[in-house]
A protein has these predicted regions:
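Active-site-adjacent structural elements in enzyme catalytic cores
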Residues: 2-106
Length: 106
């Protein structure tokens, strides 16, 4: 049996002001996990570019690499380095519906 000791640092930062948003950004830059309210539930997120943070997120959720978490992006340009190729149909949907509730699996 393989057990892993993991210290998870989780922050719940209310984003009611610019200072709150700046604190949330610092927490993410520092590799911490962050509680994020969505339109339906609270999620746990991290900086997708921080491999250590992603490992802590997977451990906190009891998941392995076979069930990776989604990566949320604010702009199509943010996909550079995340996906190998963005199909033209997906790009057209992004341009038509972002920002907004559009989920794409690439």
């Amino acid at each position: 049996m393989n057990t892993m000791s993991t210290e998870t640092i989780l922050s719940a930062v209310p984003c009611l002001s610019e200072d709150d948003l700046a604190r949330a950004q610092r927490e993410l830059r520092d590799g911490h996990l962050l509680v994020v309210p969505t339109d339906t539930v609270y999620g746990i997120g991290c900086n997708a570019a921080d491999a250590g943070a992603v490992e802590r997120l997977l451990a906190a959720k009891g998941r392995g690499r076979q069930m990776p978490p989604p990566v949320l992006v604010a702009d199509p340009a943010d996909l550079t380095g995340i996906v190998a190729r963005v199909p033209e149909a997906a790009r057209a949907l992004m341009e038509a519906f972002w920002p907004g509730a559009l989920t794409l699996i690439l």
